[in-house]
Amino acid sequence: VENYELTESAKEDLIRIHHYGVARFGISQADKYYYNFFTHFELIASNPYSFESISYIKEGYRRCVCGIDSIIYKISGNKVVIISIIGRQDIDQLL
């Protein structure tokens, strides 16, 4: 697996996180955090089985921690699908 795609929900999560970061920490810090997600997306795509399985919550789903957020994804054929990016919320309620 070497490529990934983001669901609309994951794209909305990224926008929400960035807007929050700008308001709370300023544009420079928010941008650094935002771009760090894409580094993690690449890591996930290159080694998708290296990260924690959360099949106990939803079958086939995995989680990669990025800062204070968790990237929720699944492997679908020859690509990784980024499902959502969540913070400290209850993961069970979001999936």
Question: Which sequence ranges carry the predicted segments?
Answer:
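Enriched for short, Lys/Arg-rich terminal
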Residues: C66-L95
